[in-house]
Amino acid sequence: MDLEMDIPFHCRKNEFLIHNQFDLQNISNCEVIIGNIIISEFDYPIITFSNLEKLLGNLTILKSPDTVRIDAPIMELISGTFKMIELTSLALISFPALKWVNTLHWKILPILSNVHFNNEIKGIDNIIISDTSLTGFSGFLAESIENLDINNNRFLDTIESNVETISGELHIGANSNDVKVSFPKLKQIGLLNINDVEKLNLPELEFIDDSLILNNNNFQQLKFSKLNYIGGTLSLFENLGVNDLEFPNLNELGGGLVMINNSLIERINFFPKLKIIGGALELIGNIKEISLKNLKLVKGSAIVKSTSSIFDCKKWSKTEIMLVVRGGRIECTDSNNEKITSRTKEDGTGGELITTPTTTTTTKTNSKSTYSGGRSGGNDDVKMNKETTSSSSGCCGGNVFVNGLQHFTLFQFIAILITLVNSFVLPL
């Protein structure tokens, strides 16, 4: 941003290090500052920027336990990052004229409950708000941001934004148990990671570049009406209250489909158009029915563990799942802990089912055997096969006969000779 004006020398330098009122007074008449302001271990309750309108740099305020209030009545612009960290007594900040800031990075502000900002702030790319006492988050006009991370704000019950694109990550977690999240215009996002949320409203979301992670949430309904692609994994873990899921247009997952211990989800029939799962399929819980009618390809394994007595592993393992899994095995464990496994073939022609009962016995094998072909008996069988193989050349298997003679005594040999002589002489 080009500002054509003369800026006094004392208002221009790389860093302005401020620890007390005297340091702050040195820049009190600056309307524009070029450089980074760093306030640490400030020894007064109130920090005031009376005349500052534009800061071409970062504003960092940290580790100042005495500070309870920060005022900037006419500040319009912070071109870089507005960072506040470890201000344990801060209760209020007031920037009523602020219209532009690039990054908000607020952490460990445990009693901050009042923020007075202009409702038309633009230019924000990254927002991190963690460990505050804020009750709401809204009011930013950016159509596109890179990252939004709102976590560990124990009183925060409303998160709203009209942002349309988040190129990086949206992470929400460990805020109030009844927090309601609404992004009514969001269409595309990189990574979506939502935890501990009561309501989630994303009616326009169509495309997720990375993964969709929904863990430990309190919502009952979850609808992604327009979502058609997830580039990574779809993970739903221990969302104990959800009983109504809708993914009517989801066509492809670049990663796996993982659903674990979502107690009220008994029938997995809400992916009517899903064709491709680029990773593994893993379903664990009180599952009574699995219906993935349009599924054509699973590039990983398929693992199902059901605690419902209604679910029939044998029946499910013989369905079309045999033809679509390419990544290794199909494994299904029922409520009796009986496991059925199958090795699948890459050409989609199915595989052999193997049933493993609840209790299994271990067969002891002879570890001394080193022969890998022919019969699979003990050492005697292996030795015989080796002798037979080594004597297979030449006439009549002579070596076998010689080896056999080694086991006869002299008297047995004489008796055999007499018998042979008599057989030739007597006919004469």
Spans of model-derived segments:
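N-terminal signal peptide
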Residues: 1-13, 421-428
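C-terminal low-complexity, Ser/Thr- and acidic/Pro-rich disordered "stalk" regions positioned immediately N-terminal
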Residues: 328-400
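Cleavable C-terminal sorting propeptides in eukaryotic secreted/cell-surface proteins
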Residues: 397-428
